[in-house]
Curated annotation (Swiss-Prot):
Residues 1-159 form the Obg domain. GO terms for molecular function: GTP binding; GTPase activity; magnesium ion binding. It comes from Ureaplasma parvum serovar 3 (strain ATCC 700970). Residues 357-435 form the OCT domain. This is GTPase Obg. Monomer. It is found in: Cytoplasm. The gene is obg.
Length: 435
């Protein structure tokens, strides 16, 4: 199965249901009055952080995700049912981008935190809503709002709690297979692992995910080898295991092998070297390993502890793992406390939608003369109300005209050169201009 850490999807929220015109017809109610119900709200689409998810694989073939529309209103003042919202569980560490501007819209790091991505449209009002002392029998109704339609880019920057890094053939795949459920491909040649391999263990009712990050080589920070594709995955790990092979056949120059990884981390992002890094020397059972270990110790001059193991024979692996997990829990506690102080429980993603809500409408209009007596008029305010108010009743025609008057529509047309009898196109509506 391919590892999916980036995908682009279109999210289409549901439209609001339409309101209706209806009248009470009971024989014992001589002046029945309006009885048209409102439409239900369209379904919204949310992202939900979920610690049980580890990949975006489930979105690989879902290019478009839709929520259902609200139901239309009914007679006897019955409102249409609201559509159910759609909740998409994504792994913690998922970053949501605007694919056009590359702006970060959300950084999902808390389990069960919800992010509103595409908002469903409000239901349209039925004629009962418009009843007033001045209009006891309104022949007015609205269509439901359109749901938001957005495209987002998802990138998984955290695939694991603990990352295992090192040069190719350091023994990372063998190590992760000794204490987790991972079954990576292992062999004695470089780049056996071409995708991150995830393994899971449980401690104190906590699930801890390890990632065998494919081997790094010199120049990885510039994209050489597997480069950027996998360096980004270690940015969000709580700590790193720097695994180095003591086998002279793998690393005849042990100092260069050590510094290659350290330098690549620094070059990619300086703060990576500030993470807790546990240095683990592997293959201690190989000929020449003790000599390489001594060279490494002398070079580090007690500035960093070296944990010595053999992943192949499982020598000292359990002790090393216990120490790593203690560091992990300490780092996780600090991180979660910071998040609680900074973030609310739920967030609404802020972006410019092509379906603005009525309270946020820009009333600016653009008038284009397309022929001698034909004008086309555009604008957010016009687009919104041209959809919401169907011109099928006299009352709705009057209401739509009032919306036009509120933005000095006629005056602006006169200034643009319109005269009586000209055709005015407002999206799907064509009107005859009257001075």
């Amino acid at each position: 199965m391919a590892f999916i850490d980036k995908c682009k999807i279109v999210l289409i929220a549901g439209n609001g249901g339409d309101g209706i015109v209806s009248w009470r017809r009971e024989t014992h109610v001589p002046e029945g009055g309006p009885a048209g119900g409102n439409g239900g709200n369209g379904g919204s689409i949310w992202f939900v952080g979920n610690h049980n998810e580890t990949s975006l694989e489930f979105l690989k073939y879902k290019k478009i995700i839709r929520a259902k529309h609200g139901e239309k209103g009914d007679i006897k003042n019955q409102h249409g049912a609201n559509a159910e919202d759609v909740f998409i569980n994504v792994p913690l560490g998922t970053v949501v981008y605007n694919p056009i501007t590359n702006e970060i819209l959300a950084d999902i790091n808390i389990d069960q935190q919800k992010y509103l991505v595409a908002q469903g449209g409000l239901g349209g009002h039925g004629n009962t809503h418009f009843k007033s002392p001045f209009n006891k029998a309104p022949n007015l109704y609205e269509l439901g709002e359109l749901g938001e339609n957005v495209e987002v880019l998802l990138e998984l920057k955290t695939i694991a709690d603990i990352g295992i890094i090192g040069l190719p053939n350091a023994g990372k795949s063998t190590l992760i297979s000794t204490f987790t459920n991972a079954k990576p491909k292992t062999a004695n040649y470089m780049f056996t692992t071409l995708n991150p391999v995830l393994g899971t263990i449980y401690r104190d009712q906590n699930r801890i995910i390890f990632a065998d990050i494919p081997g790094l080589i010199e120049g990885a920070h510039t994209g050489v080898g597997l480069g950027h594709d996998f360096l980004k995955h270690i940015e969000r790990c709580f700590l790193l295991i720097h695994l180095i092979s003591l086998d002279p056949n793998d690393n005849p120059d042990i100092i260069n092998a050590y510094e290659t990884i350290v330098n690549e981390l620094k070059q990619y992002k300086q703060n990576l070297v500030n993470k807790p890094i546990v240095l683990v020397a592997n293959k201690i059972d190989q000929i020449g390993a003790l000599e390489n270990l001594q060279i490494l110790k002398e070079y580090l001059k007690n500035n960093q502890e070296i944990k010595i193991i053999s992943a192949l024979t499982n020598l000292h692996v359990d002790n090393m793992l216990d120490d790593v997990i203690k560091i992990y829990f300490a780092q996780k506690k600090i991180y979660e406390q910071r998040l609680k102080e900074q973030l609310p429980v739920d967030q609404i993603l802020k972006w410019t939608s092509d379906i603005p809500k009525s309270k946020e409408l820009d009333k600016t209009i653009e008038i284009i003369k397309v022929d001698d007596h034909i004008f086309e008029v555009f604008g957010e305010y016009l687009k919104y109300w041209a959809h919401r108010i169907p011109l099928k009743t006299q009352d709705n025609l009057i209401r739509f005209n009032q919306k036009l008057q509120s933005i000095n529509f006629n005056q602006q047309l006169l200034q643009a050169g319109a005269v009586a009898g000209d055709s005015i196109k407002i999206y799907d509506i064509t009107l005859e201009f009257e001075e």
